[in-house]
């Protein structure tokens, strides 16, 4: 079994570990997909804690210290509460499988397609450095602490979250077909079903 910390989030009487349709009177396709904080937060924190000695062979202490500090970002109840008040259509608490896994599950649960801009997905430099060290894909790294929110007004949702002190960005939109498309500049690829989390390659 994989031995790493797993957080379980409960908000307002229901769990946010699967996509939840919050506002059932609204169509889901054609809405903005908002992501809070940064991808790979939980996995980065776990790797910095469990493999710090190895990381310090290449990186300064400041990198591992900052990465271990990502634990403070793991609670998602504040953004869930703000999203509910600000008209969220659906929410999904990302965990295993990283942002790619979270997006695939979100689309599947809601029965929509996706058009996602990879360059708009927020990531911390510490996550990039640590994933590079262990040869991991940061998009598939344990991402507890980040919430995916579907909303009619993506910019309005981002503004509400930022006013509450929660970093957020619009990373794409839902679509009315089953295609889950990832855009990276002019390059286009399709999102594949969630794979085992990248952290399992290092911590088993």
Model regions and ranges:
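Helix-biased detector of long, well-ordered alpha-helical tracts
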Residues: 1-204
